[in-house]
């Protein structure tokens, strides 16, 4: 996969893209990450990428020319049209399902804005997606693009050492992930559940499944509205409700 980031602040990405999973993914050639300063594409004699909004108002608006030219340059040698994703608080809420969808693409371009906003023609005629990572406002789209890049890249084949970890992640199954424990079995009187040390894998799987359901019901009950529960899950859910 190829991922290009269009930004005015490329230095922000150095640490994130040069460490942990994203670094390993690049070393394995699972992904090619490029950070591009779209100011390099401006034709303004003052090297500017923004201007005052028509009709008046506070703030500056990103002009279309450098962003259009940057995207066109990055895609001139590609056969398949890439997904051009605008980081925007007005966009579609980012979810695990969206991450899985984007992970199936060959080429992604993330456009990170600053200032008051984007010229509307960028939205109407250039981008394919607008994505928000939450109902709050950031200084720019850089942090949001890092979040999405990390979420997408870890889904690529061969990136994670254990595929089971990916499958069992919170949201991948529609439920929040179950609790985890490690040594020691007794820490200051706080003990690991006996079932996890029983060696009975069937009982362990059932415990983890039920605890995932419990955690989802307690912390994110809205997720259960989107999930068709199995007969066993419905039974467990009734037990969980009685235990509350």
Swiss-Prot record:
EC annotation from Swiss-Prot or TrEMBL: 2.1.1.228
Keywords: Cytoplasm, Methyltransferase, S-adenosyl-L-methionine, Transferase, tRNA processing
Localization: Cytoplasm
SUPFAM superfamilies assigned: alpha/beta knot
GO MF term (any one): tRNA (guanine(37)-N1)-methyltransferase activity
Catalytic activity: guanosine(37) in tRNA + S-adenosyl-L-methionine = N(1)-methylguanosine(37) in tRNA + S-adenosyl-L-homocysteine + H(+)
Amino acids binding S-adenosyl-L-methionine: 113, 133-138
Gene3D superfamilies attached to this UniProt entry: 3.40.1280.10, tRNA(m1g37)methyltransferase, domain 2
NCBIfam families, sorted: PRK00026.1, trmD
Name by which UniProt lists this protein: tRNA (guanine-N(1)-)-methyltransferase
Organism: Bacillus cereus (strain ATCC 14579 / DSM 31 / CCUG 7414 / JCM 2152 / NBRC 15305 / NCIMB 9373 / NCTC 2599 / NRRL B-3711)
High-level lineage: Bacteria, Bacillati, Bacillota, Bacilli, Bacillales
